[in-house]
């Protein structure tokens, strides 16, 4: 598998995981906000029903007060409370559009209309016939209130209480489930990203280190050309290892050929030096050994030509080495380009991580809105508590008035006690609502903290991506070092080429001198001094050739082949 394919696979997996986290978070938060809006509406509905209960109780108390004291203020109070009940029923219709509540609302309206009509009859009849007014109040009107209005309101109130509790339980359960889901998905994504990144780095660094070690040994160390780079990967590094092994094999053949040629050059130079000394020592007897000198010159010329041919072959081999070195440099540049592509892909993954970080911030803002809504619910429950306390105070006042009325106020005292109990129950319910709201606020704050944990995990993912980018930069630096070392090998090869060219030039010069000596053999007797001088030059050239051959052999001995 190619390195590029591995990188794209890892990035795709991480991006899919991140999108999954963001999508699930947005879905969960949207669902929670929707449920809270529904809870808010129902609690507002509940508040209006409680208000209707309170006004109905006040209306009944005002009617009893009117019958006892004949105070017109009670009549005005009854009218105001009746209007408040009708307004509350209208607000309830605006708040709730569900058909399941319509029948309850209609029952309350019908019963209250009947109750209000009887209430007005009591007020009208009291001025002319107080006894009739009391009969209506404690008879038919009381029956409608006890069997019609109050049960209808209480039934709807109990139903709303149960639905509010169920909705709160559902919101709490959804919050816990979303928290667990986000933590699990985030943990799996982080672990998967770390494992895949380690696997990718291992598949890159192991073959790269092996190749780099071999190149260092060739450039600065043992120069062992028998070693092979073993890379089982089928990616760019596997291809690079195969190319490198082919290069070392070709280089081994070239070094062997150069070694053989240098040995021949050394042997030829030694023979040439020996011949020159022999010619010099026998220059005084040149006339008697003319034929021997001619034979030696012929042999010397043949050996010089062979040396020239060997050196030419050596020069061609070194040129091939230089060409192969250039190819390796091109491969190193290609490897550097691949690493740069990998670095850009990791940077793209880093941008995706930052996008998810912004999405989690948006989710946190949604939860902050939820906390604000629960605070508003808490204010509403506080208002209910205040109303219940006022009702309790009114009940106390009614009990005092009943005590003052004596025997006639006993029934009114019983009603006042019932009102007080109802106010206490309302106060307890309001306190319970405040407790539940506080629980929701605490859970919301905990969810906000969990989102902060998610943000920290995303930040860790960003840091990990930045570290991966640093590792790619380190790979690029290593590739640059490999390229530099290959360039040093190319420079050394160029120096070797220059040395061989000097040897070639010297051998050609020697060949030319040998031919000239052979051509002038017949005139040696007349120019023995010139021949001695020529033999000195030949001896010097042979020594130079021998020295160059030794230097070439020293360079070759650096390689193990």
Swiss-Prot record:
Compositionally biased tracts (Basic and acidic residues)? 277-287
Q: List the membrane topology term(s).
A: Multi-pass membrane protein
Q: Which GO terms describe its biological process?
A: chemotaxis; signal transduction
Glutamate methyl ester (Glu) occurs at 271, 530, 537
TM stretches of this protein: 7-27, 181-201
* Expression induction: Transcriptionally regulated by sigma-D factor.
* Region spans: Disordered: 269-302
Which PROSITE patterns does this UniProt record tie to the protein?
CHEMOTAXIS_TRANSDUC_2, HAMP
* MF terms (GO), sorted A to Z: transmembrane signaling receptor activity
Outline the extent of the HAMP domain: 202-256
Q: What is stated as this protein's family in its record?
A: Belongs to the methyl-accepting chemotaxis (MCP) protein family.
Q: Which Pfam families match?
A: CHASE3 (PF05227), HAMP (PF00672), MCPsignal (PF00015)
Question: Where does this protein come from, organism-wise?
Answer: Bacillus subtilis (strain 168)
Q: What is its main location?
A: membrane
Name the InterPro entries for this protein. CHASE3, Chemotax_Me-accpt_rcpt, HAMP_dom, MCPsignal_dom
Q: Which residues carry this modification: Glutamate methyl ester (Gln)?
A: 494-495
Compartment(s) where it occurs, according to its Swiss-Prot or TrEMBL record = Cell membrane
Which keywords label this protein? Answer: Cell membrane, Membrane, Methylation, Transducer, Transmembrane, Transmembrane helix
Name assigned to this protein: Putative methyl-accepting chemotaxis protein YoaH
Q: Does the keyword Transport apply?
A: no
Q: Which residues form the Methyl-accepting transducer domain?
A: 275-511
A cellular component annotation (GO) from this entry: plasma membrane
Q: Which SMART domains match?
A: HAMP, MA
């Amino acid at each position: 598998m190619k390195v590029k394919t591995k990188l794209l696979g890892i990035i795709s997996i991480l991006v899919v995981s991140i999108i999954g986290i963001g999508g699930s978070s947005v879905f969960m938060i949207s669902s929670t906000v929707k449920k809270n809006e529904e809870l808010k509406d129902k609690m507002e509905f509940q508040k209006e029903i409680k208000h209707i209960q309170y006004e109905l109780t006040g209306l009944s108390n005002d009617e009893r007060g009117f019958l006892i004291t004949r105070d017109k203020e009670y009549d005005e109070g009854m009218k105001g409370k009746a209007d408040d009940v009708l307004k509350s029923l209208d607000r309830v219709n605006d708040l709730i559009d569900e058909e399941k509540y319509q029948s309850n609302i209609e029952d309350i309206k019908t019963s209250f209309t009947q109750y209000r009509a009887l209430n007005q009859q009591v007020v009208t009849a009291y001025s002319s016939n107080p006894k009739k007014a009391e009969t209506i109040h404690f008879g038919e009107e009381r029956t409608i209130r006890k069997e019609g209005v109050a049960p209808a309101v209480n039934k709807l109130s109990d139903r709303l209480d149960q639905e509010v509790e169920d909705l709160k339980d559902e919101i709490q359960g959804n919050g816990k489930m979303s928290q667990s889901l986000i933590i699990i998905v985030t943990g799996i994504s982080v672990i998967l990203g770390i494992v895949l990144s380690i696997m990718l780095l291992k598949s890159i660094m192991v073959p790269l280190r092996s190749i780099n070690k071999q190149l260092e040994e060739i450039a600065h160390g043992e120069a062992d050309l028998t070693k092979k780079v073993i890379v089982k990967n089928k990616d760019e590094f596997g291809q690079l290892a195969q190319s490198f092994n082919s290069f070392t094999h070709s280089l081994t053949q070239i070094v062997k050929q150069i070694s053989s040629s240098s040995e021949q050059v050394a042997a030829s130079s030694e023979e040439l030096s020996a011949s020159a000394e022999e010619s010099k020592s026998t220059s005084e007897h040149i006339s008697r050994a003319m034929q021997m000198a001619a034979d030696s010159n012929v042999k010397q010329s043949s050996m010089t030509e062979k040396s020239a041919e060997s050196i030419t072959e050596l020069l061609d081999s070194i040129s091939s080495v230089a060409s192969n070195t250039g190819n390796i440099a091109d491969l190193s540049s290609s490897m550097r380009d691949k690493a740069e592509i990998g670095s850009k892909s990791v940077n793209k993954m880093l941008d995706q991580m930052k996008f998810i970080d912004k999405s989690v911030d948006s989710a946190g803002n949604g939860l902050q809105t939820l906390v604000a809504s629960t605070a508003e619910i808490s204010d509403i429950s506080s208002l209910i508590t205040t109303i219940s306390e006022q009702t309790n105070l009114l009940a106390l006042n009614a009990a005092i008035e009943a005590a003052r009325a004596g025997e006639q106020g006993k029934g009114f005292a019983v009603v006042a006690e019932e009102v007080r109990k109802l106010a206490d129950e309302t106060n307890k319910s309001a306190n319970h609502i405040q407790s539940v709201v506080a629980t929701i606020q605490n859970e919301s704050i905990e969810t906000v903290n969990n989102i902060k944990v998610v943000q920290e995990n995303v930040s860790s993912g960003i840091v990990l991506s930045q570290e991966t980018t640093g590792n790619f930069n380190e790979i690029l630096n290593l590739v640059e070092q490999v390229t530099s070392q290959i360039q040093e090998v190319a420079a050394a090869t160029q120096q070797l080429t220059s040395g061989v060219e000097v040897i070639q030039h010297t051998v050609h010069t020697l060949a030319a001198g040998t031919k000239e000596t052979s051509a002038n053999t017949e005139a040696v007797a007349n120019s023995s001094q010139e021949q001695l001088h020529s033999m000195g030059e030949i001896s010097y050239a042979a020594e130079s050739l021998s020295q160059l051959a030794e230097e070439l052999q020293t360079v070759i001995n650096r390689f193990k082949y």
